[in-house]
Amino acid sequence: MARTRSENYDGIHQGILDAACDLFASQGYMRASIADLADACKLSRGALYHYFDSKEAILFAILDEHVRQMIADVEAGIAKRTSTLDQFRAAIHAIVDLNARSPQEQRLILNDLTFLSEADQQTIKSLERRIVDLVSTLLLQLDDQGKIVKRTKKVYAMMLFGTLNFSHTWYDPKGGIGPAEFADMVVDQFLYGIAGHAAPRAVRGATKS
């Protein structure tokens, strides 16, 4: 007979993911044991297995949820804008904002993805490619100088995502530059450079002091 779900199943499920994410990021996925997970979640091992059948399943759920949320945020940001530039800026804002709120998840996706099975890795990578494709398509539409061609498209895309994906290693969203201002800096620097002339910003979240 199938086991019945508790009334707070979804809340406990999410609590496990949140606690596991913190544990994996601080202690390391490979060093964290099921016993450590149970302690962090304040659950017995048996209760933990009621929600996930393995430590790997928990890691996959964390990464899958994070990347799907990023896709949803990027698509929502793009849908609210009409011009390509505003859509591009909104997409970068969405990525920066989520990464600023989820540095642990970003750290796990960069460092621990390879601990998943090949099939699960491909699932996550396929979702990541959707984000890259969304942003790269906008970037290509903004290129009025013909710099982005088949030979250079991936290089330009990875230059941009390199800045975004590894910002958790040095960027403090609680510091002097908030996520909205940082996102604008990324867009302006990537599209116009230090010496270039930046276009007016339709998407502005930062306030001047």
Residue map of PLM features:
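Hydrophobic/aromatic residues within well-ordered alpha-helical segments
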Residues: 12, 55, 66, 70, ...
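Amphipathic alpha-helical packing segments from all-alpha helical-bundle domains
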Residues: 68-71, 75, 119-144, 154-158, ...
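Basic, helix-initiating cap at the start of DNA-binding domains
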Residues: 1-27, 32-43, 57-60
